[in-house]
């Protein structure tokens, strides 16, 4: 029976190694930044930088209007950079609200490296505070897509924006991990990014858009978010739309334009 013990020991070792690898490389699995050269010139918009608490410079592309009534802050997904955000939000640049596209650390022309959930949230708050110096909160809309819905919902929970729009949101990164790696303990994750909890704590209206054909983040996660505050959360199903299609569907732009009226 010694062979049974050897097999069990080998499986246990493989399990420990799997957990160790996932812990060490989770940033690589979660974040897929596309960096841009320091001299890269965006084809549209006005570029500037904000400084994080530790002095790291974070890149912003803005579309400002002389008589803007408020501001829209867009937080993108786990891939790309502000360069991709330009076409994902193209229909919003002519609204009578300023539009701000924000790159996380290591994305686009932003400096630094993402190392913790608290850091992600704090950087997003720095950007929100920048807008709050120019506009009352009742005229600030936060919008997020995919990965960015975790930060957008956090800003909604910690502040009092006019509205929060979430395209293709996840219930949490922990829930996403459990879809495929349920055997790995939750404490391994440094980035739980609990959107459900954030939306439950928020006081502003929330609109969720989610493709019913999304085979990456299940539509059921949008229903979970709706369930935590059914009177305050609006869920807009997008029939036949997949994960990437949620941010490109005309319903996203229509929704944001509706909530700023």
Language model regions located:
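Membrane-embedded segments
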Residues: 57-130, 134
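Active-site nucleophile loop of the alpha/beta-hydrolase fold
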Residues: 165-175, 195
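Acidic catalytic loop of the alpha/beta-hydrolase fold
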Residues: 213-217, 243-244
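Catalytic histidine-centered segment of alpha/beta-hydrolase-like enzymes
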Residues: 241-251
């Amino acid at each position: 029976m010694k062979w049974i013990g050897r097999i069990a020991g080998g499986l246990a070792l493989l399990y420990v190694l799997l957990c160790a690898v996932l812990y060490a490389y989770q940033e690589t699995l979660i974040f897929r930044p596309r960096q841009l050269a320091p001299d890269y010139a965006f084809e549209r918009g006005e570029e500037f930088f904000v400084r994080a608490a530790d002095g790291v410079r974070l890149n912003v592309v803005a579309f400002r209007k002389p008589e803007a009534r408020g501001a829209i802050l867009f937080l993108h997904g786990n891939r790309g950079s502000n360069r991709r955000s330009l076409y994902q939000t193209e229909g919003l640049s002519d609204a009578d609200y300023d539009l701000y596209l924000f790159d996380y650390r290591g994305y686009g022309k932003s400096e630094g490296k993402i190392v913790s959930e608290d850091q992600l949230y704090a950087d997003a708050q720095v950007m929100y505070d920048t807008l709050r110096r120019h506009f009352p909160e009742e005229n600030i809309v936060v919008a997020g897509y995919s990965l960015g819905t975790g930060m957008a919902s956090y800003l909604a929970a910690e502040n009092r924006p006019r509205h929060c729009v979430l395209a293709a949101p996840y219930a949490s990164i922990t829930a996403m991990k459990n879809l495929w790696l349920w055997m790995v303990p939750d404490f391994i994750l440094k980035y739980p990014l609990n959107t459900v909890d954030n939306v439950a704590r928020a006081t502003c209206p929330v609109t969720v858009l989610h493709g019913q054909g999304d085979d990456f983040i299940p539509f059921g996660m949008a229903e979970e978010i709706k369930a935590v505050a059914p009177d305050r959360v609006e869920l807009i199903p997008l029939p036949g739309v997949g994960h990437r299609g949620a941010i490109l569907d005309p319903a996203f732009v229509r929704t944001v334009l509706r909530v700023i009226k």
